[in-house]
């Protein structure tokens, strides 16, 4: 199989970001590098019989409970994510408050559990008081993170309204770049105090008598990176972050705080040594970067890199929590993750059409494998956010007349709407592939879930083999599948298949026949496909 060109940075930095050279990024494009380098094996011919894999699923071997907060999303004042995306006052498709109804409907289909805002890089220069009060009186600013004019017509009150419409918990990231302790404390006061103080009464004056009860708060975004406004080293952030955490929790002790992490122990350890008793999560970001369709296997293998970031974050957090005998350990918040073609769009000044990627079937396979990984790491990953919801590296794109659901929308919908809440261990033996950066990767990537009553099993199976089908032989241990069930597939004519406004259904979810029963059964997984099997057990 062709390994393709090297789509991922090899230099070990968070992201190749040198503003003078015109390269920007949203998050960590690469992280700890895989040291073993090998060449990809030759491809098998398309006419050869299906390869075989064996998969053993035992309902007694549980990995842990899946936190519904892993199905979160993210909206940032970047490109057309907010204006022209979620919020479009001039659109005939908007409701009376300016929210695009078609975007809200699609977000409901994704079962977004919590929604992160206002950034992202944008948060490091955002002053929340600019975005409250009468809209026509709000000051317009020039955003130095993404080089766009910001009208501030979408602010805290509008964000809370949007969250409520899609039944998502709000997750606010405060400004630790140009922001102050007073500003962060006042924001919590505005959102969460019932009244009797200046900012809670200001919220009432603005037409919102009841407190918002915002539970999740992030203490800054990617402040470790030189691309960030107010960039700091770990020691400085650890000291400053502690003070932010103190005043925010003094305003409302019930809130959950997310420390700014990087997935790198050299940053995460000193940060958590300072903030351990104050925070509930530490963040990690991962983006796989590829602008070459030939990088098929290199891209799909890169999910292993995301898993390495998760393990690194969890190792530090769990170790320090155990040493301090913290009753509830600090969890990992993978609050930005996705696949992107390049970062060049970020440096385009005054261009609102940034990062509007037409995702392919290959990208949908990557998203499904990433979700499998997040589910398998459910013991430590308790919050996750796909970046972002609409138009910007997003599963949907708007036009003046409608909404397009891209290929990545469909695995997101399947996992959030049909997964069980308990992750199961899967012992899998699958044929493997290797690339320049990622060795010994299984063609068949699997996650299994059940419910607390162990009445139903779901199997999410990604066949990453481009050249042919894979025949999976399943064993359920002492359990039996009842006849019936449901099966869904996401596939297309080739890995480059994409949805467009002219051809919106090239890649969608299709229901197919599932004829399984007993403790052993077989299922043939089409090449480059996502298959979803669910059945009751006894």
PLM feature spans:
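N-terminal secretory signal peptides
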Residues: 1-13, 31, 36-39
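Non-catalytic accessory regions flanking glycosidase/transglycosidase catalytic cores in CAZymes
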Residues: 18-29, 40-268, 272-281, 306-307, ...
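Active-site His/acidic residue clusters
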Residues: 285-301
